[in-house]
A protein has these predicted regions:
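DNA polymerase sliding clamps and clamp-related checkpoint/processivity subunits
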Residues: 1-173, 179-282
Length: 282
């Protein structure tokens, strides 16, 4: 198995962040699912790595990778933040080929960062061949910090991600919005579009095998711009399970659970606000 454990030097002491993993495809697999915009903000703490991509200060994707997923995760400051081009990072991570977790060999990764103004350095090794990449970082633009406290949640569903992906892929593309509806008295989770050919409903029964939990404290019915929901399709494609929560303002959060090696899980959160224009028109 390739690794860099024998290549540590005294230079490692200058790094404020150092990550090592035996299978770089894991991080590539997760980050590819949130790559709908180029700029990404990395936030590293003792709890792990969080990578945020957002658009128009509204829709947002966050990938979370806990320290246990890495072979080594060393951080020398309480919090480290920087911004870099995610597309460039993925090109570096995939320099040896496909990022498919099930195919081919797995390159080893070592990533380190020395602080503000310095590049992120990446070493990849596969079959004795080592590639050294450096990616320029910039001062990060502040991202929205969505406060999704449990007290504000009025609807929550845990269900199969495969089922939700199938529904999303078949939504009427002529519809500007998609509506999520559920209520304490309803036996279904309803997804509705409003296209040129009319209104189209998909009802997923509460008692079906694909729904694990459906809890609702009051009637929920909010619309979302279909174009803003599209970035959720990639995480749906690699997740085993999804938790959907809606708060009293209509903010929806999808949390995708993604299984990786050694029975560890990584998570991706997707946030999208309700379409206020449509809510006001009703």
């Amino acid at each position: 198995m390739p690794n860099f454990s024998s290549q540590s030097t005294s230079g490692d002491q200058s790094h404020i962040l150092m990550i090592r993993m035996d299978n770089a495809k894991i991080i590539s697999h997760i980050l590819k699912a949130i790559n709908f915009k180029e700029n990404s903000v990395f936030c590293c703490t003792k709890d792990g790595l969080k990578v945020t991509v957002e658009d128009m200060k509204s829709v947002q994707l966050n990938a979370f990778i806990e320290p246990v997923v890495f072979q080594s995760y060393v951080i020398k400051e309480e919090e480290i933040k920087f911004q870099l081009n995610l597309t460039v990072l993925l090109e570096c991570l995939n320099v040896f080929g496909s990022n498919n977790l099930q195919s081919g060999t797995s390159p080893a990764l070592k990533l380190y960062y020395n602080g503000h103004g310095t590049p992120v350095s990446i070493l990849l090794e596969e079959s004795g061949v080592i590639t050294d990449c450096k990616i320029r970082t910039v001062h990060f633009d502040p991202v929205l910090d969505y406060d999704f406290g449990s007290a504000n949640v009025i609807g929550r569903i845990i269900m199969s991600s495969e089922c939700l992906k199938e529904v999303f892929c078949e939504l009427d593309s002529t519809s500007d919005t998609v509506q999520f509806s559920l209520s304490p008295d309803s036996a279904n989770f309803r997804i509705t579009t409003f296209g040129h050919s009319g209104t189209y409903h998909v009802d997923i029964p509460k008692e079906s095998d694909v729904i694990e939990t459906l809890h609702c404290t009051s009637a929920v019915s909010f619309k979302y711009k279909l174009t803003l929901m599209k970035p959720s399709i990639k995480p749906l494609g690699i997740a085993q399970k999804v938790s959907l929560r809606i708060d009293d303002t209509g903010l929806v959060c999808f949390q995708f659970m993604i299984k990786v090696e050694d029975n560890h899980n990584c998570y991706i959160d997707f946030y999208c606000p309700a379409d206020v224009d449509f809510e006001e028109d009703e």
